[in-house]
């Protein structure tokens, strides 16, 4: 098996012939379950039908009508839990590979320089968005389509949020994200980077300048465990992934690594370590396989790289480079030793700089995405719901519609 490069995509894309062949397996359901199961309403049933009839531009238009990050979602969305899970073809052999078909179309869109999005009219006034992650980017597109002049404030040097700083390049190449964002900027969305709201620029200042403000700050801070507070050779998963991404994978790796956690972030850490040359990588999760939080796609690809995954154990003691685990249901005990220990046990947002907003456990309580302040809305990871990219797209789109409804009502008073 050839060595996987950090910058090369792990999963190959479809050629036109393979895409048409895969689309031809579709049963062309009248009321397609796959379309009903997509949180972003990307409508796989419709774009697969277009591919089947060789109408690639029509397929791209269907995707972009509902999902400004179609190329991103095609690569990182847990489709086996969503649209592919609803595929009727599963009852015959296996579901349609919806993710790769969507990736083929969005790649074709870029390769042929399709112009699907048009600049917005900017006739309805100004709206500010805090955070240029998936929720903020999608909201900016929806608001621009509705006629608003949108400015996104992003604290990092480049937009993208977790898409840029956390997801490994072999899952999401930077060029793909750059192309998605360039398309959004061409619509007329203004993105101001290196501009953190909550410091010299306050939420109150934005409220004074804009008709509405949407908060889409992500959960970019990694969580730790009290057990490991005094331990050496311990790193938070978010920090490790950011280091690897910023260096294009050019970082040193240990001879052995122990990852604690069982979600997609843990799988990304484990896969990154193996791809960068770490000989021994073990991942231990407290969840048992039947309830594993990682997507099947991530879990399978991580195992294929040679990562050892142990389920059902939780850490109870640490001594130097050794960690002792107890089984969550049985009396079993396990002790593992590794040069480095990486904690992938959750993430949280930094909301303490937004004193005006009430938040509990890093979640902002909203009613239809509206906070206690009627002119301030929230979407993405900081509202209740799933923490995947496709759900961020969903909340960004719905929050934009809620803002539009609020401003329309304000004008009619």
Swiss-Prot record:
One Pfam family, short name: Pyr_redox_2
Keywords: NAD, Oxidoreductase
SUPFAM superfamilies referenced in this protein's UniProt entry, alphabetically: alpha-helical ferredoxin, Nucleotide-binding domain
Keyword Cell membrane: no
GO BP terms, alphabetized: pyrimidine nucleobase catabolic process
Protein EC: 1.3.1.1
The keyword NAD appears for this protein: yes
Domain of life per record: Bacteria
Molecular-function GO terms, alphabetical: dihydropyrimidine dehydrogenase (NAD+) activity; iron-sulfur cluster binding; NADH dehydrogenase activity
Coiled coil: none
Residues involved in NAD(+) binding: 287
InterPro entries from the UniProt entry: DPD_II, FAD/NAD-bd_sf, FAD/NAD-binding_dom, Helical_ferredxn
Catalytic activity, as annotated: 5,6-dihydrouracil + NAD(+) = uracil + NADH + H(+); 5,6-dihydrothymine + NAD(+) = thymine + NADH + H(+)
Protein family per UniProt: Belongs to the NADH dehydrogenase family.
Function: Involved in pyrimidine base degradation. Catalyzes physiologically the reduction of uracil to 5,6-dihydrouracil (DHU) by using NADH as a specific cosubstrate. It also catalyzes the reverse reaction and the reduction of thymine to 5,6-dihydrothymine (DHT).
Self-association state and partner proteins as the record states: Heterotetramer of 2 PreA and 2 PreT subunits.
Protein name: NAD-dependent dihydropyrimidine dehydrogenase subunit PreT
